[in-house]
């Protein structure tokens, strides 16, 4: 392998807008990185995920455009 061709692999402090912070390794040239959503505040991980009821919307679509179906 060639020497001195790879970027430095350093610690990177990641901070979320919710206040959660953690450290990881990265080749980024920055010391810190800011994100908007993390596993502490994302609805999928917190259990506050909304389920969208699309059944009514699909029926409405079929009613409106069903006459144009190929089958």
Swiss-Prot record:
Biological process terms in GO annotation: translation
Record keywords: Metal-binding, Ribonucleoprotein, Ribosomal protein, RNA-binding, rRNA-binding, Zinc
Entries under PROSITE patterns matching the protein: RIBOSOMAL_L31
Cofactor: Zn(2+)
Binding site for Zn(2+): 16, 18, 38, 41
A cellular component term, taken from the record's GO annotations: ribosome
Cofactor stoichiometry and binding remark: Binds 1 zinc ion per subunit.
SUPFAM superfamilies in UniProt: L28p-like (SSF143800)
Matches recorded under InterPro entries: Ribosomal_bL28/bL31-like_sf, Ribosomal_bL31, Ribosomal_bL31_A, Ribosomal_bL31_sf
GO molecular function (one): rRNA binding
Keyword Cell division (UniProt): no
Lineage top rank: taxon: Bacteria
Pfam families registered for this protein in UniProt: Ribosomal_L31
Matches recorded under NCBIfam families: L31, PRK00019.1, PRK00528.1
Recorded family membership: Belongs to the bacterial ribosomal protein bL31 family. Type A subfamily.
Record's function text: Binds the 23S rRNA.
Complex formation: Part of the 50S ribosomal subunit.
Designated name of the protein: Large ribosomal subunit protein bL31
Organism: Laribacter hongkongensis (strain HLHK9)
Gene: rpmE
């Amino acid at each position: 392998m060639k020497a001195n061709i790879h970027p430095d692999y350093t610690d990177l402090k990641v901070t979320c807008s919710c206040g959660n912070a953690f450290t990881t390794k990265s080749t980024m040239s920055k010391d810190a990185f800011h994100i908007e959503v993390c596993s502490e505040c994302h609805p999928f991980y917190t259990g506050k995920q909304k389920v969208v009821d699309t059944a009514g919307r699909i029926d409405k679509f079929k009613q409106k455009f069903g006459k144009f179906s190929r089958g």
